[in-house]
Amino acid sequence: MPTLEWIGRDKVINHHQEVPFRVLERKYSFDESGQHKEDNGSNNMIIHGDNLEALKALLPRYEGQVKCIYIDPPYNTGNEGWVYNDNVNDPKIKKWLGEVVGKEGEDLTRHDKWLCMMYPRLRLLQKLLSDDGTIFISIDDNEQANLKLICDEIFGSSRFVAQIVWQKRTSPDARKRMSNGHEYILIYANDPDNLERCINLIGLDETDAGKYKNPDNDPKGPWVSVDFTAQGFRPNQMYEITTPGGRVIGPPEGRCWKNLRDVFEQYNSEGRLWFGSDGNGVPRQKNYLSEKEGKTVWTWWTNEEVGHTQEATQELAALLERKAFDYPKPVRLIQRIIQMATSPDSIVLDSFAGSGTTAHAVLKMNMADGGNRKFIGVEMMDYAETITAERVRRVIAGYNKGKKSIEGTGGNFSYYELGEPLMLDSDHLNENVGKDKIREYVWYTETRQPLPKTASNNDYLLGSLNNTAYYFFYEPHQMTILNYEFLSTIKEKAESYIIYADRCALSDAELMRFGITFKKIPRDITKL
């Protein structure tokens, strides 16, 4: 498999492992009762901060849990006039490049910069994707080729599903000699060999449903017909049949019937064959609208089906009562993705949240089908509160679109900022983040699972997994010692024990006898 090389690659290829783990600090919650400081328990999140650090912060709760990821990263067009700088020359990105890539960063082309920015973020997104998850990435011609190569490397070329072509305009730009009317969406699935786990059929629209008719008043309802013949010669599919009008016929020349005689007899007895209005034609098989589960997804998405950029701009301006973004994505486009890639209780992540289209689409889908999908949106720019979160607030509560009142979808979310790092530069625990955050982190580094919310008689028990009990014997303001006194507090029966403490007073022989692995705080706490 080809490997893409660029200046700075060696500095960023494992950088996701060096990103400091920061805690997420909830600032407020919002629901149908409005905005408030009390935690409403919402699993919907809008996070303001560097998405590289935010993705790292999500790992303890969400590694391997996200069913659908959609991202719309900067396209690297070199245009500095957009609200979202699209040439990776944003001061925050430039500062990060200087720190990570070093002196080489001064010689980076804009393509090098873009690849340095994207690579570690994609590595963390891959960790968050569930076994049956799918990632969708919007891009245009500026970086499509580079994106495909690094995605093949990170996700695996065998997991590439398709490249969607989205018709983003309704007409050519007459000011240009050559007008670009499309963008791409790259799709990778974690289980491509069982694609039905990852990709759903999509629903029929009014145009599709309008193709179904019922000229014979079939009690099963409207239908479309398909050919009941097939190419080739198969002796057991060359039988004669008698039409309802009494004509005896065989297959057309050069063809055979589609199925064996017993299948034909079954279909005929069930009224599933159409012989034309006179009852003497070559049979066609009826496919009923009522039995249609959906339709196959095509890789060509027209603006009539899923919207266009002008629609999206007008949609957002009407919602916020001002022009806030130049090129947002239409809600219908993201709804198509959610319909393809989620079940009613899935988690949807967008780490380039922008104007909040993905959260808007999730809320609309839940309203339409009664689902309980959860959204996580991450936005590094300062408009995370004034545009991203404000849009979601209005979608939940309802808003006015001109003289028309748009009903709220209902729902809720909590707004987060990136907090302090959990580990200080001296490799000591940052006690300011609180014991609960530290416990959650330690459990995750041991098990790669979210910390269970189960009551225990021992405050130091994190939980049990695979017959191993995990204890984090930690107090911010005093030394903790693994000794017989602490062992007497352990009531959890397990085959083995992993116990964190500041010191250990037990001998190696005693640890072995009790099946204990001692881990020293903070030395043995794994860095993500």
Label for each model-derived stretch:
Residues 306-328:
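Class I SAM-dependent transferase core
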Residues 84-109:
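Aromatic- and acidic-residue-enriched carbohydrate-binding clefts of CAZyme catalytic domains
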Residues 49:
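Cofactor-binding loops of NAD(P)H-dependent oxidoreductases
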Residues 39, 106, 110, 318-322:
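Short amphipathic alpha-helical segments at helix-loop
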Residues 64-82, 151, 348-363:
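Conserved proline-anchored active-site loop of SAM-dependent methyltransferases
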Residues 92-100, 304-313, 362:
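Active-site-adjacent bridging/hinge elements
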Residues 40, 75, 88, 99-101, ...:
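Catalytic cores of nucleotide-enabled group-transfer and carboxylate-activating enzymes in metabolic
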Residues 1-38, 43-44, 52, 58-67, ...:
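Accessory, often C-terminal, charged low-complexity segments
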